[in-house]
Amino acid sequence: MDKRVKAIVLNDPGIVRPEDSEAIPVLILKSPHKDSEFTRDRVKWETEFARRAKPGIQMTLVGGNHVNFGDLPLIMDFANVSGDSKALNDTVRTVLREFFGEYLLGKHSELIEKGAANYPLLKIETQP
């Protein structure tokens, strides 16, 4: 990995390879997984990837799906978008701002460490 990279976010990644992880701050922000053999493997890969990071944080966007990680649900009418698009988008944007604020700018973030009542769509799986 390029040494200029100081922190990364994987927004609802497809497949991650644990051996590609680095000892830098990593946030894996994901939609809920359906239970299947593939997703059980995917959870193992994501967990190992996060374990190798320093720190490795995993969060789930409750009620969302892959489309909710961008702004398309806000500007286009998608039939397959679940949940409150604005609330989900606000949660994603805030988490990204807080994560990079903490790990690139040194601004402490309670949201990243503990979550927040005003962001009920965010579930912290592993903490820093």
Regions found by a protein language model. Give the residues of each.
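Arginine residue identity/basic-tract feature
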Residues: 4-6, 17, 40-42, 51-52, ...
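Primarily recognizes the serine-hydrolase "nucleophile elbow" in alpha/beta-hydrolase
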Residues: 1-22
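Alpha/beta-hydrolase-fold serine-hydrolase catalytic core, especially in secreted/extracellular enzymes
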Residues: 3, 63-128
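Active-site-adjacent alpha-helix of alpha/beta-hydrolase-fold enzymes
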Residues: 24, 29-89
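Generic structural signal for short, flexible, solvent-exposed coil/loop and linker residues
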Residues: 17, 47-50, 101, 111-113
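Short flexible/disordered coil segments
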Residues: 7, 39, 43-49, 118-128
